[in-house]
Amino acid sequence: MFVDSVEIIIASGKGGPGMVSFRREKFVIKGGPDGGDGGDGGDVYFEVDNNTDTLASFRGTKHHKAKNGAPGGTRNCAGKKGEDKIIVVPPGTQVFVDDALWLDLVEPKERVLALKGGKGGLGNAHFKSATKQQPTYAQKGLEGVEKCVRLELKLIADIGLVGFPNAGKSTLISTISNAKPKIANYEFTTLVPNLGVVSVDEKSEFLMADIPGIIEGASEGKGLGISFLKHIERTKVLAFVLDASRLDLGIKEQYQRLRLELEKFSPALANKPFGVLLNKCDVVENIDEMAKDFCTFLNLEAQKLEAFGLEPYLGFLHPHLTSDFENNPNEKSALFVLPLSALSALNTHALKFVLLEALP
């Protein structure tokens, strides 16, 4: 089950109480105080685990508390510190307190201290003085800290797929990566985001994210896309997946409507480097002319993608690819326009290299 938002209560441990005791030895009638200090309460940490990409483990487990510190002992023995609570979260988890961002956990194996445990109380040995040789009191341990927090997951991926329902995004990610999403010939087959690792060669790989299809009005809450657009906010490059076979909505209109929804949701998201994939090209006549015309529409002065071992349908590549985005952050031209067929794996092998080259 994919879960990307939960509310939990976290609490650090209470400090253990100090001990009231006196030294007892043979022939010693009144030994001095020797009560030990209480142990500190356990701390609460958040730890990033790369092996998970959902917050589903928090369903049904609302309270997460560290252990209390142990009481102090006799003979000046300090109590044991309470056991820490390690809360494991997927990379990209944000922690909110009262709707304000508190922690943003993105680094693999990152461990962040969230709450410090209460300090253990002092034993009566600390309170001996010239006028008080036999103190009969010790400190209580300090209380721990409790917070109600909301965990929000924003997946971290290199490439984010954007498209209308049934454009073939799920088929594409299943073809070129290790992801195994549900695939069917109807809209909204994808109900949750999917992550897949794309292996290009023995040394190179990148992470791809597929979110549920976007419909018009998604930025205003229609359909499923708005709930998951946040999952492509962290991606480095967007890939617009357009259905070249649609008769009711051309590729230019598909692109314009998708971009409009992104701009409404987040201008920063809409300004990310991007490329365009013309899917289902194997059932379209004159796909090369369609791709050339689309490049003109995008004002893309492109060169053919002959170096990537393409199938009969050629793609088009922005000259110098990523350097233009690095040197001109306001550049809006596409990095590539590539006809392909996810179903028949046409040009999908070349796509891996194109996407790898497109990454900053």
Swiss-Prot record:
GO molecular function, one term: magnesium ion binding
Binding of GTP, residues: 163-170, 188-192, 210-213, 279-282, 341-343
Subcellular location field: Cytoplasm
Annotated ranges, domain Obg: 1-156
UniProt cofactor(s): Mg(2+)
InterPro entries per UniProt: G_OBG (IPR031167), GTP-bd (IPR006073), GTP-bd_Obg/CgtA (IPR014100), GTP1-OBG_CS (IPR006074), GTP1_OBG_dom (IPR006169), GTP1_OBG_dom_sf (IPR036726), OBG_GTPase (IPR045086), P-loop_NTPase (IPR027417)
A Gene Ontology term for the protein's cellular component: cytoplasm
SUPFAM superfamilies: Obg GTP-binding protein N-terminal domain, P-loop containing nucleoside triphosphate hydrolases
GO biological process: ribosome biogenesis
E.C. no: 3.6.5.-
Binding-site list for Mg(2+): S170, T190
Start and end residues of each OBG-type G domain: 157-360
CDD domains linked: Obg
Keywords linked to the UniProt accession: Cytoplasm, GTP-binding, Hydrolase, Magnesium, Metal-binding, Nucleotide-binding
Subunit structure comment from the entry: Monomer.
Family the entry assigns: Belongs to the TRAFAC class OBG-HflX-like GTPase superfamily. OBG GTPase family.
Physiological role: An essential GTPase which binds GTP, GDP and possibly (p)ppGpp with moderate affinity, with high nucleotide exchange rates and a fairly low GTP hydrolysis rate. Plays a role in control of the cell cycle, stress response, ribosome biogenesis and in those bacteria that undergo differentiation, in morphogenesis control.
Protein name: GTPase Obg
Species name: Helicobacter pylori (strain Shi470)
